[in-house]
């Protein structure tokens, strides 16, 4: 019996890494880059400048684009992204602090007056291959 418990504990420590495919919709074709970050906790998300995993990719010829993150550990993640149209490496805002560039969060959360909480936008990654959709929109959409 003890060896069965050891066997279960041993192999539970070695969950296979997860691949997350993200289908991004609503992009402005051939304009700037997409800056996308994955945050694995509320504390990490509060420090938006330092995501746990990140990518910057050029926007292609289509309004829809797919990227993948590989080797992710199992857990909850918030995915946040924006299209940096002018290449200044930040999401542009007007004088009221309202974003003027398109952005998206996991769970299709799209708050207009506040940043979503980690729990509102977090997704659970458990299977070796997961796929989500991000719909990019501007505040006025």
Model-derived features: where do they sit?
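A short, amphipathic beta-strand motif
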Residues: 20-26, 134
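Bacterial Sec-dependent N-terminal signal peptides
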Residues: 1-19
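Short, flexible loop/turn segments at beta-strand junctions in immunoglobulin-like
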Residues: 26, 68-71
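Acidic, glycine-anchored loop motifs typical of Ca2+
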Residues: 85-93
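Surface-exposed loops/turns
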Residues: 29, 61, 73-74
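A short tyrosine-centered beta-strand micro-motif
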Residues: 75-81
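Short strand-edge motifs at loop-to-beta-strand transitions and within beta-strands
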Residues: 63-67, 119-121, 130-132
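Beta-strand signatures of extracellular beta-sandwich domains
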Residues: 35-39, 80
């Amino acid at each position: 019996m003890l060896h069965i418990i050891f066997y279960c504990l041993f192999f539970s420590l070695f969950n296979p890494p997860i691949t997350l495919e993200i289908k991004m919709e609503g992009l402005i074709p051939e304009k700037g880059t997409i800056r996308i970050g994955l945050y694995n906790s509320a504390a990490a998300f509060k420090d938006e400048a330092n995501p746990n995993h990140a990518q910057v990719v050029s926007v292609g010829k289509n309004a829809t684009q797919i990227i993948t993150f590989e080797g992710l550990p199992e857990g909850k993640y918030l995915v946040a992204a924006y299209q940096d149209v002018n290449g200044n490496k930040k999401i542009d805002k007007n004088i009221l602090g309202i974003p003027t560039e398109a952005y998206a969060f996991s769970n299709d959360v799209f708050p207009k007056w506040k940043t979503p909480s980690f729990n509102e936008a977090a997704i659970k990654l458990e299977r070796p291959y997961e796929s989500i959709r991000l719909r990019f929109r501007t505040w006025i959409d």
